């Protein structure tokens, strides 16, 4: 059965979202049709507003509605450390943790030569420029995902930064709480041992 054109367009629009297949998109489209008119208008306004009002902070690449994000404009943050993350959602997760009070730098991706993503396509050049302009930074913490792309990006950034004499560290990666050593892969075990702390 063919849906009326407006419904078909809405289904296609929902399918552009990650993880949304045709069945889920169809359900969402019919749910949207059943929503009160005011809710649909609020929803569409929110979509338009996020595209119009949200941009990248020119300093760190975080998302913000202000000229400079709240983290970069906060003088109470530790100005000596910059934590490098892949996406703004990673920054948000680390902020929710409440343990880190330094600065951030958001790459908006990782190096992936197979996908045609090189250093120019991610926010690496601005990180290096930022470090060259700021003598206060003593440590860069690489907090990228433990994927092959994340690993290669970390290595690439580390090689660029180390000659400047800035300390480069990475988040400790290892065994999850409650996991069995026998089921862990060798990379996880190696990192767990190398990242050990004295009790």
Curated annotation (Swiss-Prot):
The keyword Metal-binding applies. GO terms for molecular function: DNA binding; zinc ion binding. A zinc finger (C4-type) spans 57-72. It comes from the Bacteria. SUPFAM superfamilies: Recombination protein RecR. PROSITE patterns: RECR, TOPRIM. Belongs to the RecR family. NCBIfam families: recR (TIGR00615). This is Recombination protein RecR. It comes from Lactobacillus acidophilus (strain ATCC 700396 / NCK56 / N2 / NCFM). The gene is recR.
